Amino acid sequence: MTLNQLLQKLEATSPILQANFGIERESLRVDRQGQLVHTPHPSCLGARSFHPYIQTDFCEFQMELITPVAKSTTEARRFLGAITDVAGRSIATDEVLWPLSMPPRLKAEEIQVAQLENDFERHYRNYLAEKYGTKLQAISGIHYNMELGKDLVEALFQESDQTDMIAFKNALYLKLAQNYLRYRWVITYLFGASPIAEQGFFDQEVPEPMRSFRNSDHGYVNKEEIQVSFVSLEDYVSAIETYIEQGDLIAEKEFYSAVRFRGQKVNRSFLDKGITYLEFRNFDLNPFERIGISQTTMDTVHLLILAFLWLDSPENVDQALAQGHALNEKIALSHPLEPLPSEAKTQDIVTALDQLVQHFGLGDYHQDLVKQVKAAFADPNQTLSAQLLPYIKDKSLAEFALNKALAYHDYDWTAHYALKGYEEMELSTQMLLFDAIQKGIHFEILDEQDQFLKLWHQDHVEYVKNGNMTSKDNYVVPLAMANKTVTKKILADAGFPVPSGDEFTSLEEGLAYYPLIKDKQIVVKPKSTNFGLGISIFQEPASLDNYQKALEIAFAEDTSVLVEEFIPGTEYRFFILDGRCEAVLLRVAANVIGDGKHTIRELVAQKNANPLRGRDHRSPLEIIELGDIEQLMLAQQGYTPDDILPEGKKVNLRRNSNISTGGDSIDVTETMDSSYQELAAAMATSMGAWACGVDLIIPDETQIATKENPHCTCIELNFNPSMYMHTYCAEGPGQAITTKILDKLFPEIVAGQT
């Protein structure tokens, strides 16, 4: 079967860039002095027996981060960024991830084999340590996984003379593997980033700096007698099987090639079931990137892989691959500033890249990537290894690496309430995703704008919307809670205290009600909104003008409005999950405190500069507005936004204390009497709610609550209650909620970890 010139036959509009990607990144855990740590793999990261994203490689201190399959290089890096964020915040606070492929100074006896549950995996690692030595096992890197797109493969298949898709794909990936190994020196030259080994790593003197220790024969390679042919897939499979039968290899995965066929559990299955994708294993960690690989590297490699497919297969495969290995070794061992040797035929690569880009009409971005490759071929200063040279001090990169590691650690802990790369999603959803990754629960974002997730563990699948809307809630429950009239009736029928009031469907009806409430404290609010939108509170009798404004604000949010009695006391939010109170929050209304110098408008701007404040529930605290509601509140207190407040004078900008309207959060879970927590849970249960926010007004929290004498009033139940405000509070310890959501959804994971 010949595949030469097949790519050239495709239409220019063919989906040439269609592919699936995955990244595996290895990194060592070190302390803040750059020394290897001897702590076990973090227990908060769940069980390594099933964790899909965070594993240990050879050493107990060597983390392996694994992305799910992504449809683009950008999404693959986004996955890796999030997993790196989780890993960085799951290790001990005095630990960081080493950003280099080559380890810091170490002794062989320091290296502890990963303490895995699987007997074979432990035995396998002990075998490797005995055979290859332990120091080499501490070398880390990046594995770049790629599957050609389904439509692209189908288009190539249609252009071929083949009738068997599995055989065709096998031939396609075999050709790609052959040319990748033939030209692997290109990867080493451009992206090699392990120019030195720290003192004591090798027993003998090794010339340095070089382009890549890891990608030379000084790195992690098989014994010289292991020679596997890539002439055919059958030859490849049979050779490895023979080495295992002879005892030269213990398992198929002990064959360490720069490229590995993937998609089946055993190699022989490739012959009848087919190769699914390729794993390219010869990438050094890029220490200039927090996640170890840049976007331009990902996309340049993608182009190079397609160029290898564009090029013809070698006529003599074994000879071409042997020459490619020798050339790679020469380039890996050469000084980072040494030009490419004459036998490195860069023109073949450049021509293939140019023709590929031209044939498929790729845009400026990909054209610029090709220009960068050409420039690096001409000038080794532009290669990654050369860029590391200025940071070598006394034949060591330890100081540079530690500074980078600490900087990346600090970045992980910046805005630690968010999940890196997913900041545009709701904060509660980000927190749930963080915990899902940490626990080892598979995830897929079904609709990012709608905050809709698919979570699964083995065959157990759960769908989650907005952080806590799940199959555990009956469909009608959130509909009932969205309707405040229905909520009040259900609670009242169950014997729980609710405020009295009336409902109106027009401004005229509401205004006609004014004579009945003109001398009363009242609350005006929309019938069916959440997050405190459109609510006005009058602790003093409202004038007709202010009452009308409050009605207009409420009607702007809904077609029906409630006017209720104002209940004096302190408002608390109780978070109820599955019949149990998990958190209690005191919310202080949006406010500013004067300094005698600045206007209220300026004080609001100062308070909004707090990095914890943001918009759309993506930060623990919300931006304070100066809209109609806030200005009405100021007017009731005799102020305008441009007035200067006296020093120490506190002015509230809202009557309602919702965090979503700029309030402050104070965690009082540990001090709130359990009787109120139990009463709030009973209210949620009466609604049939699984996850529910219960808002209680409590005049005196020292009084013990009972159903007969509740000493409180329920002013609202909230479906899809915010979780972040309970965890990241303005004051108090905070309560983790999202992890409890996951524990309830996947109790088998909790059971498996105890």
Swiss-Prot record:
Keywords tagged on the record: ATP-binding, Glutathione biosynthesis, Ligase, Magnesium, Manganese, Metal-binding, Multifunctional enzyme, Nucleotide-binding
SUPFAM superfamilies: Glutamine synthetase/guanido kinase (SSF55931), Glutathione synthetase ATP-binding domain-like (SSF56059)
The enzyme's E.C. designation: 6.3.2.2, 6.3.2.3
Pathway: Sulfur metabolism; glutathione biosynthesis; glutathione from L-cysteine and L-glutamate: step 1/2; Sulfur metabolism; glutathione biosynthesis; glutathione from L-cysteine and L-glutamate: step 2/2
UniProt: Mg(2+) 1 binding residues: 695, 716
Cofactor binding remark: Binds 2 magnesium or manganese ions per subunit.
Disulfide bonds: none
Binding site for ATP: 515-573
Gene Ontology terms for molecular function: ATP binding; glutamate-cysteine ligase activity; glutathione synthase activity; metal ion binding
UniProt binding sites for Mn(2+) 2: 716, 718
Keyword DNA-binding: no
UniProt cross-references to Gene3D superfamilies, sorted A to Z: 3.30.590.20, ATP-grasp fold, B domain (3.30.470.20)
Catalyses which reaction(s): L-cysteine + L-glutamate + ATP = gamma-L-glutamyl-L-cysteine + ADP + phosphate + H(+); gamma-L-glutamyl-L-cysteine + glycine + ATP = glutathione + ADP + phosphate + H(+)
Positions of region (Glutamate--cysteine ligase): 1-332
Record-listed Mg(2+) 2 binding positions: 716, 718
A GO cellular component annotation in the UniProt record: cytosol
InterPro entries: ATP-grasp, Gln_synth/guanido_kin_cat_dom, Glu_cys_ligase, Glut_biosynth, Glut_cys_ligase, GshAB_ATP-grasp
PROSITE patterns: ATP_GRASP
Pfam families the UniProt entry points to: ATP-grasp_6 (PF18419), Glu_cys_ligase (PF04262)
Ranges where the ATP-grasp domain occurs: 488-746
Family classification: In the N-terminal section; belongs to the glutamate--cysteine ligase type 1 family. Type 2 subfamily.
Quaternary structure (record): Monomer.
Job of this protein: Synthesizes glutathione from L-glutamate and L-cysteine via gamma-L-glutamyl-L-cysteine.
Name of this chain's protein: Glutathione biosynthesis bifunctional protein GshAB
